[in-house]
């Protein structure tokens, strides 16, 4: 099982690193001779995606091929894949199976002690230690320069199991450290280098430090091909941003993987905070004001700190498996690892490989003019408090629309003209005022028409991935069930080595298949994004709009039919029972029907069972026929609109688009009561932690216990809030545009946003007291202040951290009253006004006079 780990284009060669069948690493240079295609009249066995004949045109070098593309671009003459790394992988690695345990991954972290955080673009201060975990060796290598004392293994606070795997290399000087580390790096050159925030700091700093101390030749020796690319740009905030590319080594910043693939927003992305929320484990704490003092005064804990930093990233991946996810996507698409982080390249390669197998030729990448197109439909909610809410959502809406309408570049027939806005046109289709005479053509709501006699490339590919995901989900479930059965057997009969091994293997296989299904899910969800990206090979603005327009039609169409049915059953006229709709979902007010049938008087499972039956009836009698009728009305290729019941909620409220809360009794058949809160401050990472907790409880009381209980809670919560630690009531933001909003002395200027003021005040105090400053773009926590000797009304500090000891006196000036009003009462008032609740007891004339 030979598999590539890196392929780089350098000059006329493709420079490849690969692992052979026995697990040994190799390098080779290949003088690749690419093939492109041009149209012809004769039959050759090759056709473009439109069915026209093509013949191959071979080139001796990649340079010649690139030159030919450039020279003929204006004539639209040349066809084929112009990314020769993708074509080479496709030629050589037809079966891309891999074994993660054979791919060498380095997890690194560097320390550069200084009073202020040094810029990676200049690397001005020495590197005093480097931590490096090698997954093949399963060891932590730590290179360090002692300061006040030596690092002693027996004095370490690191866990014993980590110490057993730690190899400490003592160095006398920075040059010795860098020379020894370079020797080690070249002996065990990783295929992948990862770590936390290494793209912005560690890797550019290491590269620039080697350049500063030893020159470019030594710097380039970090690359197995002797070539390191360094680029520096200036961002919108005037900061120099340095990016490096060590050719032959893929850089996968774990911070970037976490942001891209976990689909959660955090108030802070500091490793310390992420480690705590994901692993319940933090960095090693230190008392010093900055890293320089930490290094100089406590070298023992300084090295322990480094080991723990590397270990946190290692443990995060053991839990999240984002490295496996990324590598799986890379090999599935047939691209380099780091290319997975791009928006369009994975699908570009997937479609190319699929068409190549059928001797179909992709069009050449063209420059497209971007444009705006209709977005998703969001129905304005019926603001207020509601009972008996059922929601239904469409399965994989945008991918399903692509399949239903057969949307693809080569299936386009044309676009029907229409008067007025697209929104008006969709409404007319819903009203039955527009007809589509040609049965042989599939239609979307924006007038686009597609062939039905051939299946489009895009629908075919998304269907393949869809079914692969389904198969992997099934396998993951089977192995998970197997693990449950083995665990039950061990509980009943006792554990044996054989059963334990079988259990671990089942869990391992379940995780692998789960990662594979997640990889497919990511691909499915990303295709529509690629389709609407002007840099995508198969981009067409009309197709992108055809998808969203049909999505709007699908929701409006079914809402019409649900309303017709409920009005008939409940004997009402023109009542809108669809409380809200958003992209692929509708939220329906079933309370009048539940009242008619007496279901609203039931409790517990009796209520939920009967309510579920009502929704099942609506699915069967209304929704399914509705989408079958839509498919026939629009003459689409095949029906792919399938809507399932999602939540059953006894109560709920809506206050604006994308802002609502539901007391869910059942979610897709799973009886696990919980609150579903969307868009309200409880869900915002900027909301203080204690306010998130307080608002969530207030919402629970509103939905489950009523106004009196809410008033009782708010009265007691105010006392809890004002007695809480300041970190619990701090609100989170980002320190952006600090240079823009400050003068040459670092003072806030005119129009400076409040949170930026707080960061600038903090940095002024940092200069005075010698602790680390807040950097541009950092996540910060902010608190309001009462009168103080500095005359400032707020202070920021690094999110997830605390105020430095030197300015801890400001804790006594935290303005709890203002924070309480602004961060708790203000959002609670917005909810209360919308649902006509009073969050505090008011005295009326009637109550006053008894």
Swiss-Prot record:
Residues that coordinate or bind Mg(2+) 2: 202, 309
Binding locations of Mg(2+) 3: 393, 584
Region annotation (3'-5'exonuclease) ranges: 98-322
Residues bound to Mg(2+) 4: 393-394, 584
Highest taxon of the lineage: Viruses
Binding site for substrate: 396-398, 469, 521
Residues annotated as site: Essential for viral replication: 666
Keyword annotations from UniProtKB, A to Z: DNA replication, DNA-binding, DNA-directed DNA polymerase, Exonuclease, Hydrolase, Magnesium, Metal-binding, Multifunctional enzyme, Nuclease, Nucleotidyltransferase, Transferase, Viral DNA replication
Reaction(s) this enzyme catalyzes, per UniProt: DNA(n) + a 2'-deoxyribonucleoside 5'-triphosphate = DNA(n+1) + diphosphate
Function: Replicates the viral genomic DNA. This polymerase possesses two enzymatic activities: DNA synthesis (polymerase) and an exonucleolytic activity that degrades single-stranded DNA in the 3'- to 5'-direction for proofreading purpose.
Assembly and binders: Part of the replicase complex that includes the DNA polymerase, the polymerase clamp, the clamp loader complex, the single-stranded DNA binding protein, and the primase/helicase. Interacts with the polymerase clamp; this interaction constitutes the polymerase holoenzyme.
Protein name, UniProt field: DNA-directed DNA polymerase
Organism the protein comes from: Vibrio phage KVP40 (isolate Vibrio parahaemolyticus/Japan/Matsuzaki/1991) (KVP40)
Lineage per the UniProt record: Viruses, Duplodnaviria, Heunggongvirae, Uroviricota, Caudoviricetes
Gene: 43
